Every structure is written in structure tokens, then in C-alpha cells.
């Protein structure tokens, strides 16, 4: 019988044994990494245009403009080249070769790798794990302030300590390695934007922009797949289902953001898209077809 502590992160992903719980806003849900394959024909917006059919964008025009403006803002803050050269991080043994046994030590190894992929100096950021009980957290981290007692992770920059930042992970979050990476990528995004003085904490849309940053820096597969989770359960007496969220952006916007990411990098058939969950990949595919069609239409108008 396979034991989780004997499997690497990548092996767990391939075997479909990726944890049982993920915590966001105090909720838990089952999670499973879904490896989906491209159709043999790929994404073909040209065939639709040939018959006068224009692909339909799966998000609203308002959401599209927000996402595009977010990419433009991040390009101004970090440089467009940073996105173009970002390493796309995937849930496999190549990117996370260490054994994951849900311990603090294993989570810290994962934290170090996420820091490396996000081009952050790990020595500037302390890693902590906080208990689920809010009262215990206040004793452990007295400078913590939050109205969200069920948050999955925390970023703290203590007053008067310019060079010290803390990223903390909720203890029950460690059950799920995919959600660990997604949460760490988001909180380390705060290190880049807030700790780096690029944004103020009270900036408009600071949290969703930080989620968008995870796509910009190559962690979109993790954060998009963790955005919404469907869970079914049953016992001898009853059965039911639930849907829970992690993060601030919905799957639809993640799908478009990933398509914009791929287009900016001239990736027409990115292999990493096979790691997207069913819903996200559908939104990604529709968005990429729309972007390709708009690009062809714009070129036709110019000529």
C-alpha cells in the first residue's frame, strides 16, 4: 500500500494522491490534480473565422479590461521581460522533487523552492506555520492583524523592521500540497508588491492583483486549479456536495489571464495547459481562441 510520506510531490500528482483538505476562509474540500490532454487539432480560431464564426469570450468585457489593465500594471511595476522569461512551475517531480509528508519541514522546503522560482531571497522572509485557532495565532504572532480568521495564509511586515517579513501558512493547509504552493505563491506575491514598496496595502484591488501576479510569474496552474473545488460525499444515511474557493479571482478570469499569459509569450499550444483542471482549461481554451481571433482581425484591419 502506497504511503504519502514515501512519495515525492510529483509522484503524488501523477498517482492522483494529492491530499484531502484545503483551507480558505475557514472551509475544507477535497482536491485532485487533473491532467488533461490537448485535442489533436489544438486550438484553432482560424477554422471558426473561415466560416464567419467569431469565438466568444468567456468573461465579461469589464473583467477582460480589468485583467488586461492588471497585466499592464504588473509590466510597469516589474518589467514586461519578467513575465516573458518567467519559469512556468508545474506540479511535477521536476519542479518539486522533494518528498512531501505534510510536515513543517516539508512545507518549508516547498517554501524555499517557491521563493527560488519567484526570484526572491529566502533569507529576507521568515516562514511560519500558524494553528487554526485564531487566539493561538494572536499569541504566536502578536503583530498579526486580520478580520479574516479563516485565511489560508498570511503576509506580515512588522512595523520598525524594514528588512524582516513573515509568510505564514495555516496548519491544516499543509494537508494539500497543491494548495500549499498556491497559498505560498500568493503570500510571496505580497512580499514582492508590498514588501518591495511597489504597492500600498490599501491600493485598489490589491488582493486580486496579487492573484494575477501568480499567473504573471508562472504559478497560474496552481492558483487557477485551486480557485474552486467541487466535493462530493456520502455515507450510509445521506450524500451531498459542496463548492469552495481559495483566493480572490474566479476560474473564468484565471482562464483568460492564462490565455493572455500564453499569447504574450507566443505560446500557441502551451504544454502546461494539460495540467489545468476541466473548468479552467475550458475558459483558457475559449479565451485563447478569442485572443487569436482578435489578433487576426486586428492584423487584417491594418493591411
Predicted segment positions?
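Short pre-active-site segment immediately N-terminal to the catalytic Zn-binding motif
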Residues: 167-183, 205
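Pan-zinc metallopeptidase signature
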Residues: 51-81, 239-303
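Auxiliary, metal-adjacent structural segments of Zn-dependent hydrolase domains
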Residues: 78-162, 172-178, 223
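Active-site recognition of the HExxH zinc-binding catalytic motif
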Residues: 181-196
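Post-HExxH zinc-binding segment in Zn-dependent metallohydrolases
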Residues: 204-237, 241
Amino acid at each position: 500500500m502506497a504511503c504519502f510520506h514515501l512519495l515525492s510531490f510529483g509522484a503524488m500528482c501523477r498517482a492522483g494522491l494529492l491530499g484531502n483538505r484545503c483551507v480558505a476562509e475557514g472551509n475544507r474540500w477535497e482536491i485532485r490534480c487533473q491532467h488533461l490532454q490537448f485535442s489533436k487539432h489544438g486550438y484553432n480560431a482560424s477554422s471558426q473565422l473561415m466560416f464567419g464564426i467569431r469565438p466568444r469570450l468567456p468573461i465579461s468585457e469589464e473583467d477582460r479590461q480589468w485583467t488586461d489593465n492588471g497585466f499592464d500594471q504588473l509590466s510597469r511595476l516589474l518589467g514586461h521581460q519578467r513575465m516573458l522569461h518567467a519559469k512556468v512551475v508545474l506540479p511535477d517531480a521536476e519542479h518539486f522533487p522533494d518528498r512531501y509528508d505534510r510536515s513543517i519541514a516539508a512545507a518549508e522546503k516547498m517554501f524555499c523552492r517557491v521563493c527560488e522560482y519567484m526570484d526572491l531571497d529566502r533569507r529576507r522572509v521568515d516562514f511560519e506555520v500558524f494553528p487554526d485557532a485564531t487566539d493561538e495565532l494572536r499569541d504566536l504572532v502578536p503583530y498579526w492583524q486580520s478580520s479574516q480568521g479563516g485565511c489560508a495564509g498570511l503576509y506580515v511586515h512588522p512595523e520598525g523592521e524594514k528588512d524582516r517579513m513573515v509568510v505564514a501558512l495555516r496548519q491544516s493547509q499543509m494537508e494539500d500540497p497543491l494548495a500549499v504552493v498556491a497559498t505560498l505563491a500568493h503570500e510571496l506575491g505580497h512580499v514582492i508588491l508590498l514588501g518591495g514598496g511597489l504597492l500600498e496595502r490599501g491600493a485598489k484591488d490589491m488582493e486580486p492583483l496579487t492573484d494575477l501576479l501568480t499567473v504573471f510569474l508562472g504559478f497560474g496552474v496552481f492558483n487557477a486549479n485551486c480557485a474552486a473545488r467541487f466535493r462530493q460525499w456520502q455515507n450510509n444515511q445521506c450524500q451531498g456536495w459542496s463548492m469552495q474557493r481559495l483566493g480572490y479571482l474566479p476560474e473564468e478570469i484565471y482562464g483568460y489571464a492564462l490565455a493572455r499569459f500564453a499569447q504574450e509569450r507566443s505560446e500557441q499550444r502551451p504544454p502546461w495547459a494539460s495540467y489545468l483542471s476541466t473548468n479552467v482549461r475550458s475558459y483558457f481554451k475559449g479565451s485563447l481562441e478569442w485572443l487569436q481571433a482578435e489578433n487576426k482581425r486586428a492584423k487584417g484591419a491594418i493591411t
